[in-house]
From Swiss-Prot:
Pfam family, one: ABC_membrane
Glycosites: 529, 594, 758, 1004, 1157
Cellular compartments annotated: Membrane
Entry protein name: ABC transporter B family member 22
Gene name for this UniProt entry: ABCB22
Membrane spanning residue stretches: 22-42, 69-89, 145-167, 171-193, 251-271, 274-294, 661-681, 703-723, 782-800, 807-823, 885-908, 923-943
Organism phylogeny: Eukaryota, Viridiplantae, Streptophyta, Embryophyta, Tracheophyta
Amino acid sequence: MKSFGSVRSIFMHANSVDLVLMGLGLIGAVGDGFITPIIFFITGLLLNDIGDSSFGDKTFMHAIMKNAVALLYVAGASLVICFVEGYCWTRTGERQASRMREKYLRAVLRQDVGYFDLHVTSTSDVITSVSSDTLVIQDVLSEKLPNFLMSASAFVASYIVGFIMLWRLTIVGFPFFILLLIPGLMCGRALINISRKIREEYNEAGSIAEQAISLVRTVYAFGSERKMISKFSAALEGSVKLGLRQGIAKGIAIGSNGVTYAIWGFMTWYGSRMVMYHGAKGGTIFAVIICITYGGTSLGRGLSNLKYFSEAVVAGERIIEVIKRVPDIDSDNPRGQVLENIKGEVQFKHVKFMYSSRPETPIFDDLCLRIPSGKSVALVGGSGSGKSTVISLLQRFYDPIVGEILIDGVSIKKLQVKWLRSQMGLVSQEPALFATSIEENILFGKEDASFDEVVEAAKSSNAHDFISQFPLGYKTQVGERGVQMSGGQKQRISIARAIIKSPTLLLLDEATSALDSESERVVQEALDNATIGRTTIVIAHRLSTIRNVDVICVFKNGQIVETGSHEELMENVDGQYTSLVRLQIMENEESNDNVSVSMREGQFSNFNKDVKYSSRLSIQSRSSLFATSSIDTNLAGSIPKDKKPSFKRLMAMNKPEWKHALYGCLSAVLYGALHPIYAYASGSMVSVYFLTSHDEMKEKTRIYVLLFVGLAVLCFLISIIQQYSFAYMGEYLTKRIRENILSKLLTFEVSWFDEDENSSGSICSRLAKDANVVRSLVGERVSLLVQTISAVSVACTLGLAISWKLSIVMIAIQPVVVGCFYTQRIVLKSISKKAIKAQDESSKLAAEAVSNIRTITAFSSQERILKLLKMVQEGPQRENIRQSWLAGIVLATSRSLMTCTSALNYWYGARLIIDGKITSKAFFELFILFVSTGRVIADAGAMTMDLAKGSDAVGSVFAVLDRYTNIEPEKPDGFVPQNIKGQIKFVNVDFAYPTRPDVIIFKNFSIDIDEGKSTAIVGPSGSGKSTIIGLIERFYDPLKGIVKIDGRDIRSYHLRSLRQHIGLVSQEPILFAGTIRENIMYGGASDKIDESEIIEAAKAANAHDFIVTLSDGYDTYCGDRGVQLSGGQKQRIAIARAVLKNPSVLLLDEATSALDNQSERMVQDALGRLMVGRTSVVIAHRLSTIQNCDTITVLDKGKVVECGTHSSLLAKGPTGVYFSLVSLQRTRY
């Protein structure tokens, strides 16, 4: 029953139209299976006519013509039947796969957040299911299932024909089909288990690749390319070993078909007795024996599809498991109360909670919290104290273990989940945007909003001005995860998304943390206005942003230790809140004395105008909203003309496995030669049946029986050697290709990854899919090709030796058959790039959806994501209709032409016999030889579809491997620095991001950064601050001018060696899916780092204390992108990683923005010590963190407008830009 359920999972996505298509396809496949046994029946009659010498010439030709015409009728019937088979299965395969992708993604988006914490270790899992798994099932439905049905019906039809022709012989031969089934079933079970394990093994490797590509800036910055490739390579070893086991199992399964020869030997012997003692005719004996063996081998061919069925079953089970899973917190459940008039009073009553992924670490033990309706409440406290968990519980991302949460006195468990979330607007600490337009991103907050509402929301969040500067305005693409926007711009768009929702409850989790001072002031005012009349929960580390809230709750270790207004809490001089406030008061008393808030108004009336210009400068948006080129197209222009994808080059990559290639090819040649030898012996044996001497018949029968038994033994042994050898070649070639592709990808310039079509989901999907197709090409198709060439060569040689006249005619018509299947290849290869793009786009959507699942869940945006999926699949679905027609026509033509060629062979052979040019014995030998060879060619022709896919995959592989990298990290003649002093100089630099060459970031830009000194870069969002870091890391090259380090052009360095001397801590902490220890070790130059060094680095970053409180300590799993840790915890680990690197140049891009006050002070002290003696470039919006820097450089519109120390810049007074920035941030207590 379980097996039936598993197989059923493949078809559970069919609707009524698909059932009709599958019904018609079933009729076509069954009819296709009956055609060949019917041909055998007619062939038996023809052979009897030819072998019977009692016919006269006229009578003889009349009988031949009668049966030849019958074959033509069969050919006509096969034309219709095979068209129905080809069209219906191809069409329904695509329809069901498309529906499956939608259902799977819908089910994934339906799951609660806790499911992702426990079951989805990385986005790679979902990408694989959306792309690879659905493709496997589509392939089975479109090609492998109809082949299996045709083979099964051929088995049944063969025995029906056998019983009609000679029931006694058929009964004797009937039990032998079991000999073909038992080995196949045993090996099939092994193949299912191995296939399941291979999929699980590759998940780990796929996850590593996805991280390396999606976090490529971090990988480059820490020189971790080799580490990632080494981890990727090690993760692939398990799947390679399983692949070799799969090769042996397949060799046994296919080799077991050699029992056919032994069966043929026995049946030949028994048939001779039927001729001698029961008056049976030789043609009838041959037809019955070939029906019996064909029926058995048909099942054998069906079992050869077992690998694909096993993969499809595994994929179907995995997909249906997610589809059927009903989450504990079901956003699709319509049941639940909907409050008519919600006021927004929130109450936590004795809540106990711990994350299911870390049950040993309690977050709340007995939390009680009341938030009055219409009031604003701020939650403050140390990083990891449970502030963000309050918001997660309120939105029902999780449910408490004990206690309850009430809204307006009603438990949120009793409320309809979707309605509950629709009443809340969320702005998270790390802004999550989707790879679509700015307008679409804002509409995630309110799907039916008008464009005017979008604009109004953008104005309210101070986003409208910078959006309007883009050539495409609100249609500008933000890139994968918003990569084309600066941090402040992303945050403002996410705030607009929350504002447009007009929620009853507003949830702000560090909503202004990424904004510069001016933007923060304006956005804070907008947020203050938005909170009026709404219940608002604010989480903030910057206490100046929450001093006006109604109530402030101070958290510590999951408990509320203080509650009150700002003024009330400040009265307790020894209180926790007062201590936090003190940490944020600017230490430089000079700034307090000199700054006058009243002086800043005039300055910023002009400054605000400048922001409109500068805010657009750091954008790397798309040049077109409708970019549709695939990865291959994007790469094609960069491939050197002397390097073209070819099968020869692919085989050259298999050179290390040359011994196995030799063994595999020799065994394939031998295996291929077995079939024509068997066919020749069968033809000779038919002539033996027409001998008049029983003694001679017995003697020759004995010889041929021994020959057939010998062929059976050789078939079994050779098959195992052949399949293992080619599996060895395929597995190691696949491993090498994946390693080489990832290695090559990690040499590409960052701007390549900025392109919309080169998203991590799309690349990982191709990495998995293309490599698998290449493995099938080498491990299976090349093997079949070699043995087919061997079989054809031996057959032609034998045929020409027997009778060159008939052989030439029979050989001449073989290309017709081959041509039909070659056309199939061309048809498949002509599938439009829309179909390829559909897979890539689906993978990209899935990757984004999982990465931003909290945002999707919070805004109930599942339907919007599914609409995007439907849009990207519309084109390929239309294309599939045309392809289904072509598939049906080509299949029907090839089948019918094969039957027509048999009729031609009979007619021409009969003419030669009448003319005395050949004997009937020669005709039997040649006919069976070439008909058998024709079927070998036809079976091999079926692989042309796989060859077409393989050709595309090979092209895709070499498109990556041959691409010229604009910024080569391993420049052979590059200067390898032993030590870096850290003198950095920008000389007349012009720069624009490659994805938006028309927007100039820097024009004739120059700046000097002294060695061993600390330089702070400040200015409004989008003024080019982060671009300086990107150029120092050489993520990009300037269009004009030079960036120098230690007086040498940065382009002359060996890039990876140079980056070893540069440490980076980014604005958004980027962690890999691994343990805390592994993440810190990414800062080390080698894989062997002492535990003491790791601990010291963690202590320096104020991370050690919280790490040791975790049950697994440094072995705690961080989750995909550090999802298991709080923002502050992630940032401290990222800082520890930089500390361990001990760099000469330290780049800090908002390094402390995610930390609470106490942690920030301690980390700032650690960074202060780390910066001593090093060149440090610090980007900060919080000016209190940079006032001790040796130099402060103020940027505006890509220009340096001020430069000096904190004191000297303040001395300029109200006319100074820096003075005004400090004024905005001055904390007034």
